[in-house]
Structures are given as C-alpha cells and as structure tokens.
C-alpha cells in the first residue's frame, strides 16, 4: 500500500506539481509504441472479417464442416432432383452433372477454408490478441518501475536535505543510505524492464514482413482454390454442352435458320416442313389460306408444339388457318429473312426492272446467290405455293394474293424505316418479287420435289370431317361434286358461303345485294380452270422467259401447272364457214331493251376468235375430231367461249376484235384483280384503270333476271359493237412469258398486236390487259349450236324459254 501510495503521489507531483519525470525510452521506441496500437486495431478488425467469410463451422473437423456447407447442401439437392427426373431426360442429366460438380467444389472450398484458417486467421489472432498486448503490458510495467524509481529518488533527496540541518547526524545518515539503496534497486529494475521492452519492440519491427506474409498467403490460397475450381468447371462444361447438343428437341422459332438446321441435321426447317406437309393434307382447298387470321390461342399452341417438335396432325387438320399462321409466324420471326438481308438491294433492283424478260433473269440471278440452306428452304416453300396456286379457283389464293400475304414474311429491310413506307412502296416491290417466282416456280427451281422429306408426317386417320382430304380433288372437278366436302370441312370461322346460300334460297339475290354483300357464284371458277390449257397453248414464242446462264442449251421446264385433263393437246381446226363468217354488225343493241345478251358484251374477242386461228408454232393440218360420244351433251371442245356478266362492280369494257387475233392469258398468270386489297395510294402493277365516262346503263337487267345464253339465235342476230370511250386506258406491262416447249420451238413468232389494232374502230380503246376478271362467267357453245338439227334446236328453245320463265317468276316474287 505504501508503495502504491508513493506511486500515486509521484504521479500527481509529475502531473500537477511539475516534478521531474524520467523518460527511459528513446524516440524510436516511442514511435514503435504508437505503431503497436495501430497494428493491433487493424489485425483485430481483419481477423473478425475473415472469420465472417468462412462458410463452414470454424474449428470443426472437415466432415462436420462439409455437412454445414451451403454448397454441399446444394449438391445434395441437385442429385436428388436428378434421381427424381431420371437420367433419360435432358434436365435430369444436367442436374446430375451439376450436382457432382457442386460437390467437388464444396470439397475444394473446405480445403481452402482450413488453410486460410491455419495460415492467416490464427496468426492474425495471435498478433492482435497475444503479441502486441504482451508488449503493451511490459510497457505499462516499465512505467510503474519508473514511478517507483522517481519516488525513491525524491524521498532520498528530501532526506539528504533534512540531514544537513539536523543536529543528530547519525540517524539521518542511516535513513539516507536506506533510501539510496532503494533508489538504486528501483533503477536496476527499470533498466532491466526497459531492455526487455526495447527488445520486444525491435523484434516486432523486425517481424513486420512476416505479418505482411499473412495477407500474401491469403491471396495465394484463394488463387489456388479458384484454379482448382476452374479446372473442375472446365472439365465438366464440355460434358454439359455435349449433352445439350445431343438433345435435338430445341426451339426453332426466333432462332437462326443455319443453327436450327445444324442442330436438327435437316435440310428443311422443321416448322416449314411440318406446316407444308399438313397443309398438303388438309388445306389446299381452304378458301383464304394464309389470309384468314387463325385463332390466337390455337396459333400459340401450335407454335409451342412446333418448338417441341411434337405436332398432332389429326388435331390441327380441322383448322388449316392455324397451320398457315404458324408458318407465317416462323418466317417472320427468323432473325434474318429467308431471302437474306445481304441480297435485299439486289431483289429490289430486280423488281424495278420494267422489261419482263430482264426482270425474270435478274430475279433468277439473285435466287442463285442465296446460301445453300436458304436456297433449299425457299425452293421448298415456293414449290408448295406453286402447287397451292393450282387450286386457286377453290382457295381464291392466286400467286398475287400469296405474294401479298407472304412477301413481307420472306423479305424485309434490315433497318426499320417509316411504317407507312414499309406498308406501301416496299410491300409492292416485294410482291413484285415473290409473285413471278411463284408463277414460274418450275423455271426458277426445276425438277420435282418431295414435300414429306422425313416421312414423319403421314396422312392421319381422320375421324372428323376432314377425311375427304386423303385424295385432293382436281381443280377441274365439277363444282357440284366439290362443293359438298368443301362445305363440310371448313371451320365455322370462315364458313360463310353456306349462309350466303341459305340467304339466296330464302330471300333472293336482290335482298342480299341490298345488304351490301357481294355475291359470287362458286361454280364459275372450275369452268375457268378447264380452259386453262387452251390459253397456255397460244403463248407466242417471242414472250418466252430468258434461259438461265447454265441452261441455255437445254430446253427449259415449263412453269405451268399440270395441264387439266380436259384441255385439248392441239389446237382445234378452224370453224366451218357458217361459224367463221360471223362478223360484227354496225350497231349494238342496248342490254336494257332486250333480254338477249350480246356475245361481245363481256368477251375478249368474237366467238370464233380462237378457233379461227392457230397458235404460233403449231402445225396446221387435219386433226382427229373428238367422237361425239366422248363429249358432254352440252359442250364442244372447240367452241367453248366465255361471255362474262358481272354482278358488282361493273367490269371495264373490252372491245370487240376480229377473229384469229387474241390469245388468252396463260394459266400460270394470276388474276390481276387481287382478292386482297392493295395498300392505299399506291399504284398496283396489275391495277385496272376505268374510263372516266364509263357507267352502267340505267336500264340494265338485274343479275337475278338476266336471261340464259343457250339460245342460238343470240349468235345469228346482231353482234356487239364496242362503245367509244373518252380516252384510252393505260397499258400495263405484258404478263410474264412462258417457257418454250419442244413442239413450239421450230416456228417463228407471230405478232398478235397489229391484227388486234387493225380490227378496231377509231373511237375504240384497246387494252392489252390479258387478265381474268373475278366475275362469274358462262360458257357458250358455238360449234355445237351451229350444227344442231332443227329438232334439237326446238328442244333447246323450249328449255331456254322455261328457264326464262322461272327466273322471271322469281324476280317478280322478289
């Protein structure tokens, strides 16, 4: 207690009383003392944070640590999931590989943490909690010894002063000696403690490089852990990729075409082949195919099924529009169009060429530059569209209509521009590219093609009303035979013709027209198709498509669809004098004043215009006449002619020309009056221009009361004279030429333009629109009529009068 009291008093004297204070440490050691405290703080905080980074339980054995490790728990979960899903699935295989990898990573993590704990965390703990506190403890002990020494010195000095004034020297001297010995002993203790403290401080300074190595070891251990982990990951990653690449069930929508073909090992994209094959089974005669929008839910479901490479053909055969919509969606969602961005400018430039032959040649050149994968798929698709166009009389999808609805899905610019421009100019240019390719599919892509390449889309055993698609009817089938299955198979979303038929039976044609509904006769399309072969046979050789550079020596395959059965293989002989002597009369009776329709009111030439001349390149000579027993009772193969009557709107006037000058449009050409509307304010390349002064006669007969044209007196009485027009119509470009055939190559081309102009009156306007108007047409027989016996003449007159009376009574009832 006395020693403690003396220390306190000495400390107070040094602090307040300005007593002498002995400093036993050098300046360097004082700096080391300050640094000790800073190092202690840093080491303590670092140790605390490193300990928090450890995921395992600190201080436990390796087995116990691994059970508490999150990576180990994750690995166990993945392995259990793999066992549940099974190794036969892609997801199960992925879970198994990842589970094994995570388990190995967990073991590496355990080794890493054990080494960090041993080489870094524990040394830092010793430094912060043991070594530096020991040095600081010695420093405090030295301070106490210094206070003891100073206190002894102070007391000895006071005793020495007081002994000099005292009379009795003996007791004072003995006390002074005792204090002096105490002072010397305290000084010795201070010296020893100071030396020890100095040694510890210098040792700490010398060991600073070892303390820095702790952090170097931390980085090295981490680097080694991550290297081993990376090695594990790099080893398992190729296995994972191999499993995924071996799994062929990958999405195809929105993926590049080359990637999809490479993964699936196919030449034709799966969605394209699947949709085309299904449409061949159940959609070739579907009206408005590719144009009628399908159900959104069905379309979404079918796209998802195609992504999974699983398609229920039987389910979707009832709705061909969903299949067509899926095909359009796949083409549009491709990152690059099927006709490529690289060739976009070349396609557009080719479409801008005015001359038909050069435009076709430019399109062919661009087509040959397509990459192999794109070329194979566009060839497959165009061949299908060409086959689909053979049924255009039923499905109403001409090459022009197909180009309108599919063109923007096959080619579009890489940079998105103004939406208005995209919908007008660019769309029309693309239509001008796709349409001739469809029309001349066999010229652009010669040879036959097998649509069901993989053989995995067989005809389903339909249990629904689509069973009649097992064999698709010919376009030339009788409309009455085709109408029943067509009406039965169509989905309710587009089955409107049945409703129109019921309206027609109950309320009559006038009431339907008063409702603003355009009524079309579905039987005329088959009759139009039956004369397609005769039209194609009259194409002059001067209008043949240019031969590709590689095929100039060989005859080109015909782009025409397969000829219909009833088309004559050779032109018929000329009409008899009685049939050929029909000439136009000076005057044309008004339709409103007579129930007899003039044969020139809707036809492109006189009744003998085709029979009276031979097609260029054909040989004139006697031809074997068809036996009457082989011909239908009401038609002659040489004398079928069309006289068109239009219900609404009024067709443009076509002038009467002399016989032997007009060759009809080839079968491969589309109807210029597109069923789909062209973009607004954009001139259509196939548009019709009406004369400004053209209007319907005020007294024209209604369609319901129009007389039949079976009476031969119509042709023996007055013939038509074309009506003058204020100004001639603009002449559009000629229809695309047809490829040459072997039988036509030997003859010289004959011009069909000058005789047509010669046969016109000065007031008449001439049109070279060799087109089909989308209006009902009625076949009129000339040859058979002119050769009728009087008995047959009278019988047909009676039938005609009966029909007239029936239609008049119906019109009166309406």
From Swiss-Prot:
Residues 255-445 form the Rho-GAP domain. Residues 727-814 are annotated as: Interaction with BST2. Expressed in brain, detected at high levels in hippocampal CA1 (at protein level). Residues 14-249 form the BAR domain. GO terms for molecular function: GTPase activator activity; phospholipid binding; small GTPase binding. It comes from the Eukaryota. Rho-GAP domain is required to promote GRIA1 exocytosis from recycling endosomes. Rho-GAP and BAR domains are necessary for the control of long-term potentiation in hippocampal neurons. In dendrites, BAR domain mediates the recruitment to patches where plasma membrane is deformed by acto-myosin mediated contractile forces. Interacts with BST2 (via cytoplasmic domain). Interacts (probably via PDZ-binding motif) with SHANK3 (via PDZ domain); the interaction takes place in dendritic spines and promotes GRIA1 exocytosis. This is Rho GTPase-activating protein 44. It comes from Rattus norvegicus. The gene is Arhgap44.
